[in-house]
């Protein structure tokens, strides 16, 4: 009986340690991304990959229904202004706090990525982003714009701390690839 108990405890310890070592995730995509920079190229494989590392203000499910992601709520507060309340307590993969400053930094950067073959300007042009407090932003448009939540599903939010001065190459190398998404980026081996 004692041997059976020792065997059981030993097997349980092996299973627990085996699960702890199984921490590597390999992602397979139909097509390889052209970059890990979430704002470099608005392309299906890039966007699919970025979703694993970064988050948007608004999420969209398989039925194109919106759900809260980094924003917990959004509503038009007048004909030309939307208010987005940001989720509190969110941490970047480096441990720093997510704030409205990251959103403002993101929208400025996403429109100005050098040599982008297909940018995210389509979703940001004609909009003015204003920080109200650390967890509230207003987005203003020239005329009523009911598609604002849809546009905010597309642009991945990046860390202002990690992204300041970062190039597309810094994202590809992992130096600036700090997200809030479900997986933390470790390495990208093009063609692997």
List where the protein language model places each region.
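Cleavable N-terminal signal peptides
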Residues: 9-10, 20
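Surface-exposed binding/hinge segments that line
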Residues: 75, 119-164, 182-189
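Sec/Tat signal peptide C-region and signal peptidase I cleavage site
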Residues: 16-22
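Bacterial N-terminal signal peptides that target proteins for export
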Residues: 1-8
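Aromatic- and charge-enriched surface segment that lines or borders ligand/interaction sites
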Residues: 73-116, 138
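Short, well-ordered beta-strand elements
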Residues: 23-34, 81-83, 103-107, 137-139, ...
